[in-house]
Curated annotation (Swiss-Prot):
Pathway: Amino-acid biosynthesis; L-phenylalanine biosynthesis; phenylpyruvate from prephenate: step 1/1. GO terms for molecular function: prephenate dehydratase activity. This is Prephenate dehydratase. The record marks T183 as: Essential for activity.
Amino acid sequence: MSDAPTVVAYLGPAGTFTEEALYKFADAGVFGDGEIEQLPAKSPQEAVDAVRHGTAQFAVVAIENFVDGPVTPTFDALDQGSNVQIIAEEELDIAFSIMVRPGTSLADVKTLATHPVGYQQVKNWMATTIPDAMYLSASSNGAGAQMVAEGTADAAAAPSRAAELFGLERLVDDVADVRGARTRFVAVQAQAAVSEPTGHDRTSVIFSLPNVPGSLVRALNEFAIRGVDLTRIESRPTRKVFGTYRFHLDISGHIRDIPVAEALRALHLQAEELVFVGSWPSNRAEDSTPQTDQLAKLHKADEWVRAASEGRKLN
């Protein structure tokens, strides 16, 4: 009897850029060397929840793009507790094909469907080339192609492979308002021990702070005084009390790097809540190990770092 396939959830249907990222992760061995079963999801939340609920062993989701910045639905999906973590990342060059049902010309296009993030990357092309066409929001770029196949949109901006999958004709290829635009994707699994540091790693956490003057400055200063670079910080509403926020932080370095560990210990002491989202190899050279010889000796914060790196419950 053969082993069951490894289930990987992703933003579907087939023909999305997320599916292309899934293939890159698979080629890199992120999901192991066994058979892979793809599980299309309707949203990043649904994909990540598939891992939380044990329906999938992994999920692949977009987290940041060159044109429109952070993919906030992914941040919200990760901010649901500490039982999933990011283990790898990949970047894709993003350019779209404009696809239609066979026999349709650009002059016939009155509606174009694509994901809202995709629309931000083709809207100038639309304004110039098909100025009278209306944009229709789709749950993914692949779903936009499906809408064309089903007759609910005249055209879609999607990866070229989607045309083959849905029996469409590509009228224009390599459409992108910003040349060289890229999107970063991450692979997510259930909480477990982190991989060993590589010297070029990225760590991500989510935290909330007391709503008092200076709390965020004091928290971020813990990283500055230890020479730890912050590559991204985003705020998202807590959805509990109006005007209160949780912060998503990307850090250059690994949780087992001493400067990063020190800074996270100090942040743990200040935060109302601190969620570990993962430490993983970065594909960017600037995410290098910080250099410092400072040591922290606070037992409670030490225990938090050990628990995070060993895959145990975080207190």
